[in-house]
UniProtKB/Swiss-Prot annotation:
InterPro entries in the record: Aminoacid_DH-like_N_sf (IPR046346), NAD(P)-bd_dom_sf (IPR036291), SDH_C (IPR041121), Shikimate_DH (IPR011342), Shikimate_DH-bd_N (IPR013708), Shikimate_DH_fam (IPR022893), Shikm_DH/Glu-tRNA_Rdtase (IPR006151)
Active-site positions on this chain: 68
Upper taxonomic lineage: Bacteria, Pseudomonadati, Pseudomonadota, Betaproteobacteria, Neisseriales
Protein name: Shikimate dehydrogenase (NADP(+))
Record: residues binding NADP(+): 80, 130-134, 154-159, 213, 237
Organism of origin: Neisseria gonorrhoeae (strain ATCC 700825 / FA 1090)
Gene (UniProt): aroE
Length: 269
């Protein structure tokens, strides 16, 4: 057995993840020592990797692309947020041996936009690009902030329409998207391989904030495109990452970290 409480992030890829550094900063705030690692699970091997992790003393896990919807099905019970999202980014090991699934992505995104970037969501028009687990995970919390309108656009229109029906929002084909959006959020994973969403530069003409859910170099192609196309402000997903991580940490340990100094620490690395 491991002497320290042990946590990890599961993804494919996982080597780029900054989650270990973030959670170590939270542990410093709490005044405890923890282990936090990266686990690159094979496609098709996620459930076994999670099972092995918890059976060998794991206490909690974060889940990133492409496993968030698989994590939902793996969990034995779910929070209301996870049920609404149909996707899980946080797994909590319970004392009776069951696994609880939660979704803190929406909290991380909304807190970063409203509290760190100081842009209200209420009354705004929002465009979501992508229809995977990451996007589905943030819609319930975005709706709680009462935007005037949420539109979802995806390369595969059927997936966008499925989410639109589920959450009572609008869906349009990516190629048909025009301007008129205050906040544009990229939830596609194309940036990880340098690809841009297939949208017109015109969509950014009224944009107050263009936001990419990924961070660092992976966000650069989309944010450069948005900036050059007229977006007034751009942001990568580092603040969202720190915010969702803080909510996960609180679920595992009952300690709520202060995210602002951790965001600044991560920017300085």
């Amino acid at each position: 057995m491991h002497a320290l409480p042990r946590y990890a992030v599961f993804g494919n890829p996982a080597a780029h993840s900054k989650s270990p550094q973030i959670h170590q900063q939270f542990a410093l705030q709490e005044g405890v020592d923890i282990e936090y690692g990266r686990i690159c699970a094979d496609i098709g091997g996620f459930a076994q990797a999670v099972s092995t992790f918890f059976e060998t003393g794991g206490c909690g896990a974060n889940v990133t692309v492409p496993f968030k919807q698989e994590a939902f099905h793996l969990a034995d019970e779910h929070s209301d947020r996870a049920l609404a999202a149909g996707a899980v980014n946080t797994l909590v090991w319970l004392e009776d041996g069951r696994i609880r699934g939660d979704n803190t992505d929406g909290i991380g995104l909304a807190n970063d936009i409203t509290q760190v970037k100081n842009i209200a969501i209420e009354g705004k028009t929002i465009l979501l690009l992508g229809a995977g687990g990451a996007v589905r995970g943030v819609i319930p919390v975005l709706k709680e902030h009462r935007p005037a309108r949420i539109v979802i656009a995806n390369r595969t229109r059927a997936k966008a329409e499925e989410l639109a029906r589920l959450f009572g929002i609008e869906a349009v084909p990516m190629a048909d998207v025009n301007g008129g959006f205050d906040i544009i959020i990229n939830g596609t994973s194309g940036g990880l391989s340098g690809q841009l969403p297939a949208v017109s530069p015109k969509i950014f003409r009224d944009c107050r904030l263009a936001y990419d859910m990924v961070y660092g170099e992976a966000a650069k192609p989309f944010l450069d495109f948005a900036r050059q196309s007229g977006a007034k402000k751009t942001a990568d997903g580092l603040g969202m990452l720190v915010g969702q991580a803080a909510a996960s940490y609180a679920l595992w340990r009952g300690f709520k970290p202060d995210i602002r100094p951790v965001i600044e620490h991560m920017k300085a690395l």
